[in-house]
Amino acid sequence: LLQRSMPENEFLQEFECSFDAAITGAYFARELQEAESRIASVPYDPMLKVNTAWDLGISDSMSIWFYQQVGREIRVIDYYEASGHGLDHYARMLQEKGYLYDRHFGPHDIQVREIGTGKSRLEVAAGLGIRFDVVPNIGVMDGINAARMTIPRMWFDAKKCQIGLDCLKQYREKIDEKRGISFGPLHDWTSHAADAFRYLCVALNESNPATRTVDRTVVSWMG
């Protein structure tokens, strides 16, 4: 009787200890469930340049997705997050990963000048050799919809993207259950990864989708 009165995903989470069941209110639950076969080993292709998408959060929290593109196919090869570091830390991290980079995408507020330095993070990053393209501010929900439409084109490296994927799977709306009202995304530990992912997807829809290679065109490894 109890199972009949509860949504199936809630019953599985609560009583069957299923961690694969969708989180109630999770924005990307269906899309990521359908993408399960595309969460695998997705190696870095040295013949393709790497793009990054960043969320530069408060208290120096940072989330970064790394991806390569062949036509409409998006290969999400890596994810990185940290906090308590300056931009110089991330400049070193980019270099240490050894990828050949093309474009770095950041949120619109990267252009805001900080009171302490009088410089924007856009300017500070440029001084460290990281030149950002600013992603248009289309609003959170439109960004979420852009992500939902883009996930079917994506492959994710299961190992390197595990933390980021865990965030995406649990990124959910804040709901007043008594009144049935949604207050938009719940701001928690999943937010920075999800925001950076939104910027990735918005950038894909706004920028030139052409494949950028090092010195020759590479066919899709999907076969």
Functional labels for PLM-detected ranges:
Residues 1-53:
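ATPase catalytic-site recognition across NTP-hydrolyzing enzymes
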Residues 11, 16, 55, 63, ...:
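Long, contiguous amphipathic alpha-helices that act as assembly "spine/axial" helices in icosahedral shell
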Residues 15, 168-172, 197:
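Short amphipathic alpha-helical "interface-anchor" segments enriched in bulky aromatics
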Residues 19, 56-58, 108:
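Short, flexible loop/turn elements at secondary-structure junctions
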Residues 22, 65-186, 207-208, 212-213, ...:
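Mg2+-dependent endonuclease catalytic cores in nucleic-acid-processing enzymes, primarily RNase H-like
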Residues 45-69:
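Gly/Thr-rich phosphate-binding beta-strand-loop-beta motif of the actin/hexokinase/Hsp70
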Residues 57, 80, 197:
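Anionic group-transfer/hydrolysis microenvironments
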Residues 187-208:
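Acidic, Mg2+-coordinating catalytic module of metal-dependent nucleases/exonucleases
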